[in-house]
Amino acid sequence: MEARAQARYIRVTPMKARRVVDLIRGMDATEAQAVLRFAPQAASVPVGKVLDSAIANAAHNYDHTDASSLVISEAYVDEGPTLKRFRPRAQGRAYRIRKRTSHITVVVSSKEGTR
C-alpha cells in the first residue's frame, strides 16, 4: 500500500527543497513531521504540507488511519518552470533574475509486516 502527494509550482528553489527532502527520506511519517516542524529551512513548510497530504491520502484511500505505521518510501524534488525577471543596472544594462520553482513529491507506504 502506498499513497502519494505532490505539490507543483512551489516558489522555492529545487536545491533548497532537496536539502529538506534529504532529511526525511526513509523516516517514519510521524518522526518526519516532527523533524520538519522544527527545521529552520523555509522549504520545510511546503514539504511538511505535502507529507501531511500524503498521510491524509493513505487514510482516505486505504483506511490507514495510523500514521506511525507509515514510512516515507520516496521523496524527491523536480525542477519546475523558471520565472525570468530583469533588474536594471547602470548604463542601460540589465541583469537576469531567475525565480525558480519546484515540484515536490512524497510517497508513503506501510512498514513491512504491518497492514
Swiss-Prot record:
The gene is rplV. This is Large ribosomal subunit protein uL22. Belongs to the universal ribosomal protein uL22 family. Keywords: Ribonucleoprotein, Ribosomal protein, RNA-binding, rRNA-binding. It holds the Pfam family Ribosomal_L22. The keyword Ribosomal protein applies. PROSITE patterns: RIBOSOMAL_L22. Part of the 50S ribosomal subunit. One of its GO terms (molecular function) is structural constituent of ribosome. This protein binds specifically to 23S rRNA; its binding is stimulated by other ribosomal proteins, e.g. L4, L17, and L20. It is important during the early stages of 50S assembly. It makes multiple contacts with different domains of the 23S rRNA in the assembled 50S subunit and ribosome. The globular domain of the protein is located near the polypeptide exit tunnel on the outside of the subunit, while an extended beta-hairpin is found that lines the wall of the exit tunnel in the center of the 70S ribosome. One of its GO terms (cellular component) is cytosolic large ribosomal subunit. NCBIfam families: rplV_bact. GO terms for biological process: translation. It comes from the Bacteria.
